């Protein structure tokens, strides 16, 4: 289906051409004065300069040609030369029925040429718990992935774990100090290693920060960790077996935590998976003359003549031969081109890492790791801050674990749901359902609270505001969906058959209903724009507008008590469409709605 605004523009453009003016002046936009009209065209203002006449003479001519067009209720020429457009309610009702008949797509066409897109979530380091700093990459990445999938693309989400480098040597060294008799440290051992890990997730989460602290104050400990890292990367059997245990224990725990966030990955690869590609990649860069030595390090120059700021060389190997994040990211691209051959690779990472990605992307293009046809995108996100405007912390100033934050919001939502239950005596929700509902609504509060902000901007994480059932919040959106579900259930309880409602939506009978239809009609344009700009906040803004439009219609209209049966069916059919569009949108944002609240 064509976007409504495009259909309107086509009609207005035809009128401009018929009146003897260039088609470029027929572009229509949403009205910036919704109290006067629904759409507007300002083309006559620009055309007046070219055709050397008063703008209103042009707009008068065009309006006269559109007077009898069945698409419009009215097209008014307003001085000095604007066209104010109102949609015909019968045309709008047909557009609604066409959307409803287009099951699961609602007028949004799938991509004609599906792309293969890899989304790199810039995942956490293994052996460390997820903390609030991991929230944005997970939440934004999941939504970007779901939007692209809904558009019809083949999307592969990769957690991209930090499982390489000194941190692994630190863990091995600290474990050796704690449990020196483990068989993994016996170089002469040639047998099978135990299948059971010699540590639990809670032990592992204590080992890493302890080791990290020691390495900063104890030089001999740091030396031992560097040696362990080198031996691990050199293939020492016992250390390789320990790495396998670290990964298994960590990933099991990470999967549980990501599951609670409703975030899922097609690939659970780490930096270590790209390491086999490093030697060949480095050799290629040397042989082809891309890489050269500079101050002891191997680098690739990536500055360009058009640069307005200094872009340092991309370091491939440090002076001691060790690789860096840039090395790993480039080798990961080599691996992805070989295994997935993507048309686009999207990286989710803090906006402060933008220089790193400029260097890596330029190096990848210059050295031929990726062809010109593969798009490389960095979605740089802002910081999640507390009410004091500083990065979000625990009350004692520490970094808050993500599961503790989610638990805090779950508890807050559970209290609100129980309060709601007391106010509504007929709402009998047992403890188990109340807890599950609280989890569902809490997740919406967190995700919507994040995604409703433009990704690149910092935002204040305000639990009180995010968990409110009023205003631009996740719980408000869910409350609207639950309200619609309740009306539909009552309709069916009285013998109504929702599945039999086909082409039942009739022309709007009041302003609230027409406003709801106009909001629904923006669905395909909104999702297309959110995909093209990797901008989930556009979907949030849309569903907030849609929820407000529905609630306005609901308060203005007697739905279930409507005596005209055909009109009642029209209302119910419109509610079904509203519910389905809200549900498909929140699914793209990565959360769902309960049946009751």
Give the role of each language-model region.
Residues 1-93, 108-597:
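Non-catalytic interaction-recognition regions
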Residues 103-107:
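A common structural junction motif
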Residues 94-99:
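Short, charged, solvent-exposed linker or helix-capping segments at domain edges/interfaces
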